[in-house]
């Protein structure tokens, strides 16, 4: 397996694991209307990161690939926002989800770098090279 495929597989598994960890967090939240709203938002973001990263592997073009990565970037950042809100609203202690928040931040950084690299490569090739 070449480095690109190994990286893609690693990130696919990592984003899936992130979504599963968020699921466990969401399952532990209280059932108040406010908590349910934040839970639903967080769960949608985390699962969107995993689903769109997986879908990026089947992109039909460079633009399609980049679009899916941009969705992942936005959703992982938003997931971190909702976790921060859970802490700010005192629904979860920060120390209990610090590692999960760090993972959201790291995923955002990795995906942002991938977007930058892809744009640079598209510019060099005139955007004609398939993803």
Listing of model-derived features with the role each one plays in the protein:
Residues 1-131:
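Short, C-terminally biased terminal segments at protein or domain edges
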């Amino acid at each position: 397996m070449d480095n690109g495929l190994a990286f893609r597989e690693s990130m696919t598994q990592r984003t899936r694991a992130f979504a599963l960890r968020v699921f466990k967090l969401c399952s532990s939240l209280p059932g108040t209307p406010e908590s349910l709203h934040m839970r639903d938002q967080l769960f949608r973001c985390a699962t969107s990161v995993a689903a769109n990263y997986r879908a990026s592997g089947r992109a039909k073009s460079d633009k399609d690939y980049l679009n899916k990565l941009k969705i992942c970037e936005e959703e992982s950042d938003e997931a971190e926002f909702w976790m921060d809100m859970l802490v700010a609203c005192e629904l979860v202690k920060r120390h209990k989800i610090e590692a999960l928040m760090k993972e959201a931040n790291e995923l955002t950084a990795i995906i942002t770098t991938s977007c930058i690299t892809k744009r640079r490569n598209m510019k060099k090739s005139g955007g004609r090279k398939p993803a």
